[in-house]
UniProtKB/Swiss-Prot annotation:
Matching SUPFAM superfamilies: ClpS-like (SSF54736), Ribosomal protein L7/12, oligomerisation (N-terminal) domain (SSF48300)
Domain of life: Bacteria
Organism phylogeny: Bacteria, Pseudomonadati, Pseudomonadota, Gammaproteobacteria, Oceanospirillales
Signal peptide (residue range): none
One GO term (biological process): translation
Protein encoded by which gene: rplL
HAMAP family membership: Ribosomal_bL12 (MF_00368)
This protein's name: Large ribosomal subunit protein bL12
GO CC annotations, alphabetized: cytosolic large ribosomal subunit
Function: Forms part of the ribosomal stalk which helps the ribosome interact with GTP-bound translation factors. Is thus essential for accurate translation.
C-alpha cells in the first residue's frame, strides 16, 4: 500500500532533527539534488521585504519655497553647491528634487534646513 503525502508529513513531524537531517542527506544522494538551492530561493523574497522596510537612501524634494524664497535659494545653494541662477531655477521649478540618494541623517538635516528657511519639503 502506498503512503499518502499526509502520512509522510506526519512521519517526518515525529522525527528528531538529527533524523530529518539524515533523511534530507539520503534524499539528496538518492535523487541527485541539493536542498540548499531551494532554501536560497525561498530566502530571497524575505530579503527584498527587509530592503523595502529599511530604506537607506532618500531624495529631498522641495514642494514649495514658501514666503521666504530668497532664504530658500541660499539654503539650496549651500546644500547642492549650485550657482545662484541654478539654485533659483530649482526653487522656481518646485516641486523639484534638491538632492538624491542621501543617507537618512543627511536627508533629515537638509529637510530641517530648508524648512527653517520657510520651504515645504518632502523626503522620498
Amino acid at each position: 500500500m502506498a503512503l499518502s503525502k499526509d502520512d509522510i508529513l506526519n512521519a517526518i513531524a515525529e522525527m528528531s532533527v538529527m533524523d530529518v537531517v539524515a533523511l534530507v542527506e539520503a534524499m539528496e544522494e538518492k535523487f541527485g539534488v541539493s536542498a540548499a538551492a531551494a532554501v536560497a530561493v525561498a530566502a530571497a523574497p524575505a530579503a527584498d521585504a527587509a530592503a523595502v522596510e529599511e530604506k537607506t537612501e532618500f531624495d529631498v524634494v522641495l514642494q514649495s519655497a514658501g514666503e521666504k524664497k530668497v532664504n530658500v535659494i541660499k539654503v539650496v545653494r549651500g546644500i547642492t553647491g549650485l550657482g545662484l541662477k541654478e539654485a533659483k531655477d530649482l526653487v522656481d521649478g518646485a516641486p523639484s528634487t534638491v538632492k538624491e540618494a542621501l543617507s537618512k541623517d543627511d536627508a533629515e538635516k537638509a529637510k530641517k534646513e530648508l524648512e527653517e528657511a520657510g520651504a515645504t519639503v518632502e523626503l522620498k
